[in-house]
Structures are given as structure tokens and as C-alpha cells.
Amino acid sequence: TTVAEGVELAKAVVAASAEVPADVKLIIAPPFTHLYPVAEVVKGTAVGLSSQNCADHVKGAYTGEVAVDMIAGVGCQYVILGHSERREYYGETSATLVEKVKLALAAGLSPIFCIGEKLEEREAGRHFEVVTEQVKNVLFTLTAEEMAKVVVAYEPVWAIGTGKTATAEQAQE
């Protein structure tokens, strides 16, 4: 999307947010290049703003990386971590994710921690094991106070871009 398209989408989400129950939090996560203009749109509204990732370093010469203080500084309250695409294509490990989660929390951001299994893991009956390991390896390193600031997002990897969707029962498992 272009920045203009991102801004228009943010305006539409803000307008629609009036119809959302008070106990539901709407959060949008545009690309990094759209964060500032979208932050201006959602500022002062009930709509939260998230980055799609963060660096695993606070400062330093890491060309192309975006540190948590930069993300918080632009107005984000959240950061998506552990997305299946980051795990698969960028080799993000549990150790990397522990570091990112802790950096995000230290910067005042709430991590949106993604968990989910691949199709072959579900078909082999290993989905509980896989998701449990993802949670245990990263989130069990946190204190109860830190954990209270984390949003866990279940996203079955086998449903991404395949046209297949998880049933309500599968999501509730």
C-alpha cells in the first residue's frame, strides 16, 4: 500500500471504531513507512497503533533496523513479534524473540506475540505441543507483571495465504 492508502484505511478504521464494543481493542499495524502519518490519524482515538516488528538491539549501527525507542517515539503502543513469516524467512528464534519482547516491554510497548502451527504439525496432532513450546520458550521468561502487558495472537500458519481458515473450534483449542 502507499502512505496515502494507509492513511485512508486508518481514517476508515477510526470512523468504524465507534461501532466496536468498549471491551474490544482495535489495533492497526501499517508498514514502518506509514507509522508516523497513521499515528497522526489515530492520535486521541480508541484505535491502537502497532509496528510490524522491531530490532533486537536498542542502539547501534544496524542498517535498516528499527529500534523500540523509535517505534514508541512515533506513537506506537504495540509491536508484533513472533509472526510466522519472521520466524520462517528471517530465522527468528525463541532466543531472538525473548530479547525483542523484553526490549519492547522496557520501551513501554505491549508485544503482540504470535503463535501458531504449520499444517503438517496440525495433521500430525502436534499443534498443542508446538504452540505450548512457542509460549513456554518466550513468555515463561517474563514476570507476571510483564506477561500482563503481552497480547497473544493465535494465527495458524497453515491458514496464511492458503484460503483455508481455522474453525472456531480450532481457534479455541
State the predicted function of each range.
Residues 1-173:
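Active-site loop-to-helix "anion-binding N-cap" substructures in soluble metabolic enzymes
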